[in-house]
């Protein structure tokens, strides 16, 4: 990792400010070949993290831009290496010329995620923090950003490390008793082992219990829109999206497949799924769409059951209602409140009933309130919510192995058998933070990053 890398950290689109990011042994001195301080002093004379004005030159020595730069010396930098940033005006041409000048000065193009990979390999962060960097970049709500920021600061690592370290101590003591039976080593009672391992299993269970809310905070609440044809499902999707995402006509069966759109509803990130109207049909394509509608209700966080409030309920409405009631949560939406009503809300078996008019855009504040009640902000988004499927899978494997170790203890199995389970648990838990590192896992993680991060 001693080679010098460089990248445009802000992308190649026109922006107000563009940043060239550099890292590696000797990068500060090499950067001084293309960026010269107005003071005439070398770039390496700057104190850490102090912006200074200067001029960026291209590979032929021609001035490109008047800009700012700062340096950070190892190990007190993002990557743990000597680093520098040159902040220019965001001209793609100027940034490209500056990058080519850096290549001529001995830098190479950074690979996607290479700055953060170096931070991980140099011990500046663990894998949970590295993955949280991506989550922070992708965050679409304040809650998602706050939770990711907490994980960048090490919230998950602070929960995992004490458990892992406790298992290391148990393994070491177990090995000592097994390997040196004649030594005067304080024996660790079986009940002591069992209590310790059971406590750590409970801690992992508590961490896993945050997965559902963590997924909804980071990726969105999956809300499937169900109803009979022409109830206003697609109109609801369009109104919440703020634009015409799907075609709306008076012809039943216009929507024949699921259509997804992510929207923000108050503090909630919601992944809306519009579905085909549920009815009996001889049209082969529409029938496939209806079947998908029924299946979608089983794979969501909440069903939004849309009814045309201006007409009495039909058998098609009741069939759609049955599908909605199979969802984990459901909200009945009485659409077309701009017309005289024909449905009595008290006849509907729903805890949440929201009257709206997609035509007049009324009642959507009530829909937001229903989401607030169904998905309360009852857990702090401080980084403690588990949002990452890879991490959750590894924690679940660790829990299964430690539970197996407890069962082995209770069954009177030999210490060697217990150790097999415990060391398997350690391997799995170590994958969460990267203490037990697999190259295929780290490659997959850092491939998700953009160039310059």
Cite the ranges covered by each PLM segment:
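Short alpha-helix of the ABC ATPase nucleotide-binding domain corresponding to the H-loop/switch region
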Residues: 278, 286-290, 318
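A glycine-rich (often HGG/GG-containing) alpha/beta subdomain
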Residues: 1-146, 150, 154, 331
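Generic enzyme active-site microenvironment
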Residues: 272, 306, 333
